[in-house]
């Protein structure tokens, strides 16, 4: 059997929760990818300059980082987590619908910032909730979760494509387009993809990109509805009749019938998980949460976060600057052909996450991480060596997307497993990955402008090597962490008092004495065991 029966049973038990969290990540992917293809239309609609429109997207990335770092605060209860997901996914649909009405760059910046905040909250909550449900079995479900990002990211430009107009260009359109693409990682094709036969001064077919945003708003609308239905099923809506029992109540009843002792332990683990720092990133730094923890606990958080800082940075840098690299010497590809590189990259990421679902079940997470990081470095190295080979640029883009696709979900599952699902790993990792995505793009863009397009590959290779070093540091920290925590657990077992054992057996002894008395009474015997004299 491809997947063992235990995992299928676990998935069936949490099916509605899991599908809901996957659907909100579809919203996340839908929001990530629509910016690139529509950038020139938004620039023309708002009448803004390149510098002004750049700040619009910077506002979205900054608020995405804020939402990621604070989203864990909503995971204290199931109600707050689902309510935050419902509002965030609904906000994304609202933002999609009002973007065509933003004829001012300030209004557009505010709309993008609100959208980024909602995306960050979705990112953190969905990861934490899945880890809390599946724990050691979470890698396969996290891979599927991040597959839905790629699915939404692929669908978004396909919707926008028929409605994009390219007539709002000036004579220096090539220079402007080159500058524009320097700032955005989410472009799936070139924003200056104009037919060569149509002059800029001639009549151009009028297209309304507003329809693209409204269609995406409608496509995203079932997501908040799905979250609302889950809240209803969980009896979390006070104004709705509670006709059916909660889904979790059914599971707890079934588990109670089969193994009450295991249920108590599971409830205890869930309680520990919810109150062990999986909140916002600042709640992880309180004195009570950090007291008595070994130094390896902090090193795992730091090194794991730096791995994602680098890998998510590579994704942002490559998706944002591969077009610029392709149209510049020595590649000098046509803009239409170069614009396909972004779509190939994101398609490879989506396919890689889909393939990683069975792989994460068959292989250890740490082995997948080492293979993926080594593949990223080798691919970037070959791209540097074969920097004039146009065919390998497309092949290398595909392999880079495949290798880097599953690093994020694998590392989240690996670090949470190291910390026994009692740390702040998910919140810290999501926050640092957002910081890397935003920071390294600016750094790489500056180097490309100063040193030329070839520095794009050099920058990617250096970042990849640093990420591999940090991954080895995580593995080494895990080795020492298990030694330290294993020694402390052995000491607790050795020094622990054995007094509670007799107390546990006392009630059993008591019931053993009472039961014969009850039986004797049923047979009409007195307390001394003799029949009462009836005929005397």
Curated annotation (Swiss-Prot):
Keywords: Membrane, Transmembrane, Transmembrane helix
Cellular component, GO annotation: membrane
Membrane topology: Multi-pass membrane protein
Chain segments annotated as coiled-coil in the UniProt record: none
Location (main, coarse): membrane
Family: Belongs to the major facilitator superfamily.
Protein name: Major facilitator superfamily domain-containing protein 4B
